[in-house]
Amino acid sequence: MAAKDVKFGNDARVKMLRGVNVLADAVKVTLGPKGRNVVLDKSFGAPTITKDGVSVAREIELEDKFENMGAQMVKEVASKANDAAGDGTTTATVLAQAIILKVMKAVAAGMNPMDLKRGIDKAVTVAVEELKALSVPCSDSKAIAQVGTISANSDETVGKLIAEAMDKVGKEGVITVEDGTGLQDELDVVEGMQFDRGYLSPYFINKPETGAVELESPFILLADKKISNIREMLPVLEAVAKAGKPLLIIAEDVEGEALATLVVNTMRGIVKVAAVKAPGFGDRRKAMLQDIATLTGGTVISEEIGMELEKATLEDLGQAKRVVINKDTTTIIDGVGEEAAIQGRVAQIRQQIEEATSDYDREKLQERVAKLAGGVAVIKVGAATEVEMKEKKARVEDALHATRAAVEEGVVAGGGVALIRVASKLADLRGQNEDQNVGIKVALRAMEAPLRQIVLNCGEEPSVVANTVKGGDGNYGYNAVXRRIRQHDRHGYPGSNQITRSALQYAASVAGLMITTECMVTDLPKNDAADLGAAGGMGGMGGMGGMM
């Protein structure tokens, strides 16, 4: 077992505090619309330029192991805030540093760390309730656009694109951010259900000018098996031909004789058919086939439940208003499935999302909900260079997360003003003893830190602005873009309640753990450990003197 280095009490806390300050000082320069960029060196390729707090935090590793422990604990604040709300990482880091700096002084003065922690926890618990009371719903497009604009560093184009995307695919719809091909940001909306599987043969193409297959009011056959024998399909093909409608086949695979016969029939005009592979693999494929069946009012033909393809009838087939298939994707528009059945399926998947343990599973389940509930919107980010593209894409993703959080829990006054208002309301809050009262005061004072840092990053005097804002009420706050203090309307500069709440809770949680730390243990560097071992060995040789 490796030798350990151990530090106690104030020595441990001082080292930890140094690490906290290094990380927080690097992160907090990015806060607010006038926040600065941070350049991150990469082992290969061009350096990354970012204004994203969690991206900066994740890059920081300190040489001193005790200082690094402090930095890593604050890094946890940024990561947790990012996981919970997708944004607010810099705010959380600034709050954590403010609480830790002030409360460490109280601990050094001899106050009880446990009572200080209880005071901080009490203040934060009441503050969260006050934030909830202050929040107003964020439901109209103007409010959504404002939240997106603020979070994207006052980029109005991004805010409007996010609001438009939410308007088209709904609050539950999937909105993704991708690299664009030009200089302008674009919004691409895919209505209906789209999955990543294209036609199995180019001979199915009936729109040569677009290289796509378009089927109007088709029947849709869903089979959870490979189809290689055309005899299995003859009854269905004959029934569809009599009905005079096209047919889309979605199966695990269609190959050999079956595929060749379908191609020949299509080319001769006997029946208009297209075949694609089912999306996904294994259990996910079965689930997605069932989603398509629910959306189109069809039944999945599966031997697992005793259904045979030869016995399938028109009643087992799904239907849609239109299907578009190209080389890589299939889009089903306006399936005829019953609304109640679709909502039931969505509720079932939402339950699975709550129970999911991995982020990957959760993301895939959310995509399925979106495909059933509305559609998918893609925001394509335009930029002149790859470095700018990365930075802008990160900002758009943050804005998207902030907007979703605002829709979920409402908005409060942004720019740190909501925390100032909450702190003013809690001025008379008291604990069970004087040490707890100090903890409460520390938490309330720390709530000013985000506003102060935003003002500092604008090159103004934080104390003057903070005191002026404290003298007002409601949305009276500092506009960092125009660099002036003014009364704003409800949509002036809103911030997400969820992001503000998460930042405060995670900052207080980690600060509480750090102030109650009395001992830190880490491995000795290898050189120090080797020297220690060698000294021990030489000491044992003292007995050799008696042998001379």
Curated annotation (Swiss-Prot):
It holds the Pfam family Cpn60_TCP1. GO terms for biological process: protein refolding. It comes from the Bacteria. GO terms for cellular component: cytoplasm. Keywords: ATP-binding, Chaperone, Cytoplasm, Isomerase, Nucleotide-binding. It is found in: Cytoplasm. Together with its co-chaperonin GroES, plays an essential role in assisting protein folding. The GroEL-GroES system forms a nano-cage that allows encapsulation of the non-native substrate proteins and provides a physical environment optimized to promote and accelerate protein folding. Belongs to the chaperonin (HSP60) family. This is Chaperonin GroEL.
